[in-house]
Amino acid sequence: PIIADVAIANESAKSSAGIVVHENKNNQIDEIFRSMRTNLQFMLNENQKVIMFTSSTSGEGKTFNAANVAVSFALLGKRTILLGLDIRKPALGRLFEISDKKKGITNLLVKENISSNDINAQIQPSGINNNLDIMLAGPVPPNPTELLARESLKTVIDTLREEYDYIILDTAPVGLVSDTLQIGKVTDVTAV
């Protein structure tokens, strides 16, 4: 099903595209993301909360859409976390102007045993809304696909399911790398 239709920006607008969803705004772009959020809620069953954003190729707006839907959920009062799982070409730090790129999920994926404290140490506030947290990709690893295939990804997601209403995953293009196929195993719904 089509959950929303987000306009394609020209190249100059793409480079400055960021967070466009804001509290108490009723413009067209806010309404598009509210509509996407509502349609995603209809697609999810009661215990489902993990939404993966991907595309066929780079530059199609995965990060932009994932981030703005995450903000939209947070503005609804839902505890939301946005995970940077495009660990080859991370972009969330730039979008949210978070400079600490040493924190992130790759620090967890390399571990055998992960505690809640380990996970919480990698989470950062979004700076946009108190209901929205972010876990960046972290240091870029030499073996992204192998790292994402580990059981540690499921452990992280399962732990986050206990703490958050929605978990939004910003991933690599499914048409270019196999990383996203591995992530799909822990996902409840995929938006392309």
Predicted regions and their residues:
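Beta-strand-loop-alpha "switch" segments that mediate conformational coupling across diverse proteins
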Residues: 1-17, 138
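P-loop NTP-binding module
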Residues: 19, 25-192
